[in-house]
């Protein structure tokens, strides 16, 4: 998967920050989509998931919908999608809360272009590895076949199918 096909969704209500992030990433060959508010961001996400999302924690100063709500929305659709949360008013609790909800990284403004690119490149690589891992797991799971159609074999097959989709360890 080359970098040209990687699509990044940048969500920030601050036009200058949004354009700066977009410019840095475009210069490195990424395809960029932008959103400036909650409603627009949800529309973009529902239209097509990006490879990585960069979301400002504090959006829509007039409303109560913010970047955390967008993070939660994305994770319901695709738990593996890397989301980088950014904030100009960050504190440790905000960072911890974001990471607990599934954020890939948390960056405080201002940040260097090197740090931004590092996080985005790692996010893209992480997503690629998770997709490959799922593909290989599916291939492995489907390469073993049970012979028979008895009630017990069917129950075992159903149970294995459910267990194979779980993120946690099964003992």
Residue ranges and their predicted role:
Residues 137-171:
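AAA+ ATPase active-site-proximal loops
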Residues 29-38, 44:
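Short hydrophobic/Thr-rich beta-strand motif most characteristic of the beta2 strand and flanking loop
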Residues 91-93, 107, 111-120:
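C-terminal output helix
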Residues 101, 109, 149:
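A Lys-centered signature of the CheY-like receiver
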Residues 48-54, 59, 84:
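Active-site beta3 strand of CheY-like receiver
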Residues 15-33:
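Two-component/phosphorelay signaling modules centered on CheY-like receiver
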Residues 43, 58, 63-80, 97:
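Short amphipathic alpha-helix used as the core "switch/output" element in two-component signaling
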């Amino acid at each position: 998967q080359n970098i040209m096909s990687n699509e990044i969704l940048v969500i920030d209500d601050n036009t200058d920050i949004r354009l700066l992030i977009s410019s840095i990433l475009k210069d490195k060959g990424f395809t960029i989509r932008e959103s400036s508010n909650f409603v627009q961001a949800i529309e973009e996400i529902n239209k097509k998931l990006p490879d990585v999302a960069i979301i400002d924690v504090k959006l829509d100063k007039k409303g109560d919908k913010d970047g955390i709500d967008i993070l939660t929305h994305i994770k319901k659709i695709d738990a593996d999608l890397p989301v980088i949360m950014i904030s100009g008013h960050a504190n440790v609790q905000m960072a911890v809360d974001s990471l607990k909800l599934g954020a890939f990284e948390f960056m405080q403004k201002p940040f260097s272009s090197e740090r931004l690119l590092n996080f985005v490149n790692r996010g893209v690589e992480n997503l690629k590895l998770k997709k490959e891992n799922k593909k290989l797991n599916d291939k492995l799971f489907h390469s073993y076949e049970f012979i028979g159609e008895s009630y017990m074999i069917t129950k075992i097959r159903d149970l294995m199918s459910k267990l194979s989709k779980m993120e946690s360890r099964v003992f």
